Amino acid sequence: MDANLRKTLDELPAEPGCYLMKDRRGAVVYVGKASSLRSRVRSYFDASRGDDRAFVALLDELLGDVEVIVTRSEKEAVLLENELIKRHRPRFNIRLRDDKDFIVLRLDERHAFPRLEVRRAREPRRAGARYFGPYSSASSIRETLRVVNRHFQLRTCTDHVFEHRKRPCILYQIKRCPAPCVYDVPEAEYRQSVEDAIEFLEGRETELVERLHGRMDEAADALRFEDAARLRDQLQAVERSLEKQRVLMADRADRDVVGLYREGPDLVVQVLAMRAGKLQDSRSYPFHEQEFPDEETLSSFLSLYYEQNAAPEEILVPVEPAEVDALADVLSERRGRRVRLLTPQRGAKADLLEVAARNAEQGFRSWHEKDERREQALAALTRALHLARPPRWMECYDISTFQGALAVGSGVSFRDGEPDKACYRRYKVKGVAGQDDFAMLYEVVSRRLRRALGEGAFPDLLVIDGGKGQLNAALAAAKDLGVPTKPSPGNEGAPFVELVGLAKSRLVDAPALGTTRVIGRRGRGGGASRAASGAAALADAAEAQEHGFVSELARSPERVFLPGRKDPVVLRQNSAELFLLARLRDEAHRFAITFHRKLRRERNFQSVLEEISGIGEGRKRALLRHFGALRRVKEATLDEISQVDGFGPKQARAVFEFFHPPRREGAEGAAVVGPPSAAAAPPIETAAVAEAVSEEDIDAALAAEDEDAEGPAPVE
């Protein structure tokens, strides 16, 4: 062992804190925490133990230094470890990507007529609201909402629509909503539906089934057969749903069960989410190069995982995590109530841990199979594109603009075939006027490579969204900055980055692909074939079918352009390597167009606010910072607008009344009360059918949350 390292170990304090292990180049490779830094760090090098654990031999090979940070308590060390892992991204630490996948349903009981909203599990909890879930996918939450909307008939419209609607939507007519937005629905009656929905979502089936049975019999005895039929349908829906769920624990507690399976340095952590004693969800988290003990790995995982997800009252773990008491304190503080970390050795809870362990092993097998397929795809891509090395770190760049205005660029990053969103970048094009995609790409790629030169880290492959012209613009940027685009002979260690262009497939006439042409009026003039694409090609196809001609429209293949090569490479259709490249390109396009639309909304936001008197540039910016989108300003209450910096009662009222003009008195604007008769019922707004909570609503709600989450992505 190095003398300086030995001296550092001899001087370690016996106090709580964090330690940073560094390699011989000074890079942090592992971050840990301990109640006693001296005992924990020295335990890795205790020769008397005859320690043959893999990570001990690994430390002998690469460790260059150990830095320690003393904290006032073990709890503070847990929190600091999280921050250090995020900052340094050490090679041997657990790192969780921002998990947006968990979804919950929120019901705000403070509202007289509450509704169910789709929210992300990671967002702060609202006081006075109930949360149901988590759900891991839109499809699982969609089925739940379908049953609730059909049989418990809660409103689905936003608060803004609810407060300003004058006529009921079509959901009222199809008996999916009592229309409390328009009619004088008794709050007690609506509250009963809310309580039924809550019991259904919480899995309290015994109480719900008994009450529905009683109300159904009561309605039948009173000859209210329509009500009895509705209650019968509710009862059947509840019973069908409950048939799919099995109670695993009689205590009906909320708990997470954590399983762990390891083979060498690779491991999978499995989390089974149980709510009200039933299995709600199961998720696998695979990790490479986890050489350190399971106790430390599990402690880091739990701290990071429950930073993104709400902790239940009880967490079952296969081994006791390092600094378990401090970790439990941190999780309890985040939850606002006590969280217990248990390692049961026998009984029903130990059986649950065994189930989680088996799921972790199955997740490990599936992950390794997927890993092998990804390695095969990278190897095939390397061969097909004649790359100097497998493209483990790929980036793709795209431009989005509308007639040259608000031009932006995007850069997305994939590592080992998976998105690495921490490395995504957005670019505002600054030095190009008008519609010049080549110049815009030149600017964006130049800025990216300039940053790479400063950091000393280059991707293995840059993919440019476009054809030969776009690729040449990117190559020119690399050349002007002196960045090599192929390995230097005799200097294998020198950095370089390879570039390719990926051109989208196009809808073309079959002659372009060497087959029969489209025959229509446009193609009969002199028998000459023409290249058709987009709307023109579709028009030809429709015309040909109308006149009985055979249409041979086809799609050109995706083409990959390589530097110094005239003809593009055409990858095998439906191959894994083509799918990987197309997925990377499509993600760059999505990221670019999302940013472009955001800038357009901001511009529209500014132009709309121009019409409000007394709102200057400073207050416009304050509104935009506070609400983020014009839609949210429109939906905000007067009190919420008053909380924006720089807004007094006068300015807040001006903004609120601009979007919510006071309703005029009169027949048209008068409130409608009482159950409507067939003759007196207001017209149904059939266009409002979209207000039902459907797949599109869920996807839109989650897209809005994703857009908000991507907002902090660096803009260069």
UniProtKB/Swiss-Prot annotation:
It comes from the Bacteria. Keywords: Cytoplasm, DNA damage, DNA excision, DNA repair, Excision nuclease, SOS response. It is found in: Cytoplasm. It holds the Pfam family UvrC_RNaseH_dom. SMART domains: GIYc, HhH1. One of its GO terms (molecular function) is DNA binding. Residues 14-94 form the GIY-YIG domain. CDD domains: GIY-YIG_UvrC_Cho. GO terms for cellular component: cytoplasm; excinuclease repair complex. InterPro entries: DisA/LigA_HHH, GIY-YIG_endonuc, GIY-YIG_endonuc_sf, GIY-YIG_UvrC_Cho, Hlx-hairpin-Hlx_DNA-bd_motif, RuvA_2-like, UVR_dom, UVR_dom_sf. One of its GO terms (biological process) is SOS response. Residues 206-241 form the UVR domain. The UvrABC repair system catalyzes the recognition and processing of DNA lesions. UvrC both incises the 5' and 3' sides of the lesion. The N-terminal half is responsible for the 3' incision and the C-terminal half is responsible for the 5' incision. NCBIfam families: uvrC. Interacts with UvrB in an incision complex. Belongs to the UvrC family. This is UvrABC system protein C. It comes from Anaeromyxobacter sp. (strain Fw109-5). The lineage of its organism: Bacteria, Pseudomonadati, Myxococcota, Myxococcia, Myxococcales. The gene is uvrC.
